[in-house]
Amino acid sequence: MEEPPVREEEDGEEDEGALAKSPLQLTTEDVYDISYVVGRELMALGSDPRVTRLQFKIVRVMEMLEALVNEGSLAVEELRMERDNLKQEVEGLRRAGVSGSEVNLGPDKMVVDLTDPNRPRFTLQELRDVLQERNKLKSQLLLVQEELQCYRSGLLPPRETPGGRREKDAMVTMGNGEKEERTIMKKLFSFRSGKHT
């Protein structure tokens, strides 16, 4: 019967060890251990409403800590995989450099094999621009859909156009001379369809 208290002390030492670790060394199990220690200490304080409110706040903080630890673990794993890939690539280049003619392009240059189906097709900046534009268009679409829903439900009256007609009655026409603004996505994907506008 005296073994469980000894086990609790061992757990306590183990849990305190998790608290002593560097934040960069924490694992998800460490977060659970810390949560257990804090929960045990809160239970010892009693059931005062202030303790209960504090407990909910601590639970939220522990959830955020767990999410950060998971993100950090994923980032570390991605970096390890990238490091291993780079090691393999360097080893391949060393073998190729010894056997064939060597082309030194510099640190910021990259040789792209146009026959490789997995080659990068866009720069990182181009992809960022496309994603940013997509998010902007998505938010505009959501706003327009929300406004349309308000019109349909009768919360907003139809707007008057400068010509005195209601917007739903007005026809939108574009002149032949007006050029449509080319978006980044259109620029990037125009080469695929063979259109050069």
From Swiss-Prot:
Ranges for domain RH2: 119-184
Gene3D superfamilies: 1.20.58.1770, 6.10.230.10
GO BP annotations, alphabetical order: cilium assembly; epithelial cell morphogenesis; protein transport from ciliary membrane to plasma membrane
Keyword check for Protein transport: yes
UniProt keywords, alphabetically: Cell projection, Cilium, Coiled coil, Cytoplasm, Cytoskeleton, Protein transport, Transport
Record has Coiled coil as a keyword: yes
Subcellular location field: Cytoplasm, Cytosol; Cytoplasm, Cytoskeleton, Microtubule organizing center, Centrosome; Cell projection, Cilium
GO terms, molecular function: dynein light intermediate chain binding; identical protein binding; protein dimerization activity; small GTPase binding
InterPro entries in the record: DZIP_RILPL, RH1, RH2, RILP_dimer
Ranges for domain RH1: 14-96
Domain of life: Eukaryota
Coiled-coil intervals, chain numbering: 65-153
A single GO cellular-component term on record: intracellular membrane-bounded organelle
Principal location: cytoplasm
Any matching Pfam family: RILP
Self-association state and partner proteins as the record states: Homodimer. Interacts (via N-terminus) with MYO5A, the interaction is required for its role in dendrite formation. Interacts with RAC1. Interacts with RAB8A; interaction is dependent on the phosphorylation of RAB8A on 'Thr-72'. Interacts with RAB10 and RAB12; interaction is dependent on the phosphorylation of 'Thr-73' on RAB10 and 'Ser-105' on RAB12.
Role according to the record: Involved in cell shape and neuronal morphogenesis, positively regulating the establishment and maintenance of dendritic spines. Plays a role in cellular protein transport, including protein transport away from primary cilia. May function via activation of RAC1 and PAK1.
Name this protein carries in UniProt: RILP-like protein 2
Organism: Rattus norvegicus
